[in-house]
From Swiss-Prot:
Binding-site residues for Zn(2+) 1, renumbered to this chain: C10, C15, C33, H36
Stored SMART domains: ZnF_AN1
UniProt binding sites for Zn(2+) 3: C100, C105, C123, H126
Cross-referenced PROSITE patterns: ZF_AN1
Descriptive protein name: AN1-type zinc finger protein 2A
Compartments, as annotated in UniProt: Cytoplasm; Nucleus
Gene Ontology MF terms in the entry: zinc ion binding
GO cellular component, one term: proteasome complex
One example of a Gene Ontology biological process annotation: proteasome-mediated ubiquitin-dependent protein catabolic process
Organism, as annotated: Homo sapiens
Source superkingdom: Eukaryota
Chain positions of all zinc fingers (AN1-type): 4-52, 94-142
Length: 145
């Protein structure tokens, strides 16, 4: 038993399938089956008005213009490689910035290690007062137990 009044026929000239759940194109307002409802599948003449996507750079939040026929991922990738201001790979921040205060030592550390007595900044090797010959008024004493 068929229900010719139920559903709608696909508007694609080569299809005309009776579809019980047709999809109406929001650009040309015609009904299509699931295979022909995308703009490209039925060659929608009004798709240029609707199918507009502007990708945004995930690093700097800048909209990236994409020309027709270009792949958005490739264009955004090119932007990140060339023009992006927030590219983390381009930042040349120095990691080892804390130089040892011990005379003759040229080591640098990521973390600041300040002597509690003389308040100088030292590397791991010279961080203890005895190791950097701390010249503060109170000398550290070693207790034998």
């Amino acid at each position: 038993m068929e229900f010719p009044d139920l559903g709608k026929h696909c508007s694609e000239k080569t299809c005309k399938q009776l579809d019980f759940l047709p999809v109406k194109c929001d650009a040309c307002k015609q009904d299509f089956c699931k295979d022909h409802f995308p703009y490209a599948a039925h060659k929608c003449p009004f798709a240029f008005q609707k199918d507009v996507h502007v990708p945004v750079c995930p690093l700097c939040n800048t909209p990236i213009p994409v020309k027709k026929g270009q792949i958005p991922d490739v264009v955004v990738g090119d932007h990140i490689d060339r023009d992006c201001d927030s590219h983390p790979g381009k930042k040349k921040e120095k990691i080892f910035t804390y130089r040892c205060s011990k005379e003759g030592c040229k080591k640098k550390e990521m973390l600041q290690m300040v002597c509690a007595q003389c308040h100088g900044n030292f590397c791991i090797q010279h961080r203890h007062p005895l190791d950097h010959s701390c010249r503060h008024g109170s000398r550290p004493t070693i207790k034998a137990g």
